């Protein structure tokens, strides 16, 4: 808990961190994590959707004394941030309330507060600020009110990038998620799409992105690179033609065709299996011949079966082999 903020602090120790968390249980782990890593921060126990502040804590780091956590008075004023990093609870139910944070947009549906979190974050950004959200892929293509909100965000040139991540990255959910990057006063008039959904390694029950795979995403984003089957800068007009749907496969074709197997090699393998099968069949036929039947009717039926079975095996052996047929297939195949 708090890993994203810790990573931000590690890259920029001069940053002033304000962390907001609604879960009282998570607050305990968050404060512990900050103290153990020696990271100063303000932590607010807060319901972002209703803007209700419950408690406020400050983690202070001093060279002369241990890290101290002390509760301070709750400030009721608003704030503006240079950077917002958020991994809110996915598709959380909420009670829609129309306030200034959502001006110019429809309200997110009561069954899914994803866009309410997004609009709250954008509202709290400074004029040149950046907000990064980790959310389920549904926010990219769901319709009705969410579709209208997404359309207005695109028209207002606030969406800077859409990054698809592998599934099963987090311990609390196995669904694939995406990163949405928002910027105020953007210069670019397109949206960068990155498809990193296949970039992971298996680690027991989880998927992990290697440092090289993470750096590839970062470099691609920083350079806004177009890479075949991986990333692409898409114009707003093309997105408009797709009815403001941001589903990544609409803009990046990452399909990798499977190699066509060698027909002759497959035929050889099948033919070898057939030979082994016939050899085994003939051995079985020989064993059947050695059986002794005392009942005349049973002996007659047994002898007829052995005869038919042997003739079948012999006739199969003399037929055109699968290997020969495979050669014909390969000869006539058009690639």
What are the language-model segments listed below?
Residues 1-13:
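Conserved SAM-binding loop of SAM-dependent methyltransferases across substrates and taxa
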Residues 40-47:
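Conserved SAM-binding strand-loop segment of SAM-dependent methyltransferases
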Residues 49-52:
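Short loop/turn elements that flank and shape the SAM/SAH-binding pocket of Class I
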Residues 56-335:
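A conserved structural/catalytic subdomain of Rossmann-like adenosyl-cofactor enzymes
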Residues 27:
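Short alpha-helix immediately C-terminal to the canonical SAM-binding loop
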Residues 16-21:
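Conserved SAM-binding motif I beta-strand of class I
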Residues 30:
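Conserved SAM-binding loop
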């Amino acid at each position: 808990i708090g890993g994203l903020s810790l990573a931000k602090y590690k890259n920029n120790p001069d940053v002033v961190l304000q962390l907001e968390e609604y879960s009282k249980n998570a607050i305990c782990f968050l404060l512990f994590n900050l103290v153990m890593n020696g990271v100063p921060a303000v932590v607010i126990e807060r319901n972002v959707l209703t803007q209700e502040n419950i408690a406020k804590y400050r983690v202070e780091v001093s060279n002369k004394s241990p890290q101290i956590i002390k509760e301070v008075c709750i400030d009721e004023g608003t704030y503006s941030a240079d950077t917002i990093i958020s991994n809110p609870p996915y598709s959380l139910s909420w009670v829609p309330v129309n306030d200034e944070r959502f001006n110019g947009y429809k309200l997110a549906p009561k069954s899914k507060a994803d866009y309410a979190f997004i609009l709250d974050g954008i509202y709290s950004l400074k004029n040149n600020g950046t907000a990064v959200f980790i959310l389920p892929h549904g926010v990219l293509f769901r319709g009705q009110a969410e579709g209208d909100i997404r359309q207005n965000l695109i028209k207002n040139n606030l969406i800077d990038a859409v990054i698809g991540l592998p599934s099963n990255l987090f311990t609390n959910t196995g669904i694939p998620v995406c990163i949405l990057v928002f910027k105020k006063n953007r210069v670019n008039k397109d949206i960068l799409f990155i498809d990193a959904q296949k970039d992971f390694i298996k680690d027991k029950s989880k998927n992990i992105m290697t440092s090289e795979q993470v750096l590839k995403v970062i470099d691609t984003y920083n350079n806004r690179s177009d890479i075949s089957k991986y990333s692409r800068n898409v114009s707003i007009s093309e997105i408009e033609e797709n009815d403001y749907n941001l589903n990544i496969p609409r803009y990046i074709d990452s399909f990798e065709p499977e190699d066509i197997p060698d027909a002759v090699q497959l035929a050889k393998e099948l033919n070898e299996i057939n030979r082994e099968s016939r050899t085994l069949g003939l051995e079985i036929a020989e064993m059947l011949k050695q059986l002794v039947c005392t009942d005349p009717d049973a002996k007659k039926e047994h002898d007829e079966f052995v005869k038919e079975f042997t003739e079948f095996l012999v006739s199969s052996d003399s037929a055109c082999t699968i290997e020969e047929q495979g050669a014909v297939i390969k000869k006539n195949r058009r690639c």
